[in-house]
Amino acid sequence: MKQTKVLILGAGGAIAHHVIQFLQHHGNIHLTLFLRNKSHLKGIKGPNINIVEGDVLHHKQLNEAMKDQDIVYANLAGSLDKMARQIVEAMEKNGVRRLIFVTSLGIYNEVPGAFGKWNDSMIGNSLAPYREAADIIETSDLDYTVVRPAWLTDNEEVDYELTQKGEDFKGTEVSRKSVAAYIADLIQHPRKNIKASVGIDKPGTEGDKPSFY
C-alpha cells in the first residue's frame, strides 16, 4: 500500500499535536513534523514519523522538507503572509498540490452581529497578514483548503460544524481537538473541500462572545 506523505509545518502547536495523535498509528500515512524546536515533540516517535527542525521562512530548509510530499498542513503563527508565499512557492517548485492552511475567523468580515463587533475589537488589528495569506493561497493553482477556526478551547471533545466562504460564521468557539479532527479527516480524504475556505465552530455556541470571556 502506497503511503501518503504529509508535511506538518508548525508541528509543535496544540492543534497539530492532536492531528499527530489522530494520524500517527495509520500505517498508510507518513508524517514529516517540521518545527523550530524538536523538544516541543517529546515522546512522539514511530516508524511513520520523521522530525525535522527548521524555519518556514528559511527557503532551503522548507524546500528540502517539501520534497516527495503529497500533502502539506500548515498551522503557523507570526508573519503568515510571508510564510504563505514561501509555502506556495516551495510546493509549486516541488510539484506538491494539496495544502491545508489554518488562518482565523474574521478575515473576510464574515462574523455577523455583536460577536462580529467583539471579535473585530479583540483581533481585528492583527488579521491583515491572515487575510493576505488566504489571498495568496486562493490565487494559487494549489488544491487548497483554508481553515478558519472560531475562538479555541482545550475541551476534550470533537463537535464541529462548517461554513463556507461567503456564508456568515456561526458559533463563537470550537475545541482544538475538533479542528484537528477535521484536518485529520481532510488528510485521509484529500479530495474533500478543495479550493474552499472553511469556517469551523462548535454547534450551539452562538452568542455575543465565547463562553470563556
Question: What function would you assign to each model-found segment?
Answer:
Residues K2-T4, I29, R97:
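Nucleotide donor/acceptor-binding cores
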Residues V6-L7, L33-K93:
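NAD(P)H-binding glycine-rich loop region in Rossmannoid oxidoreductase-like domains
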Residues L9-A14, L127-A128, I136, N155-E156, ...:
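Active-site-lining helix/loop region of Rossmann-like oxidoreductase modules
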Residues L31-L33, V147:
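Short beta-strand "acidic-cap" motif of Rossmann-like dinucleotide-binding folds
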Residues T4-H26:
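N-terminal Rossmann NAD(P)H-binding glycine-rich loop of SDR-like oxidoreductase domains
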Residues S79-T163:
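Glycine-/Pro-rich loop/turn segments that contact NAD(P) or position catalytic residues
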Residues G12, N37, L105:
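Residues in the short beta-alpha loop(s) of Rossmann-like NAD(P)-binding domains
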Residues G27-L31, N193:
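A generic structural motif
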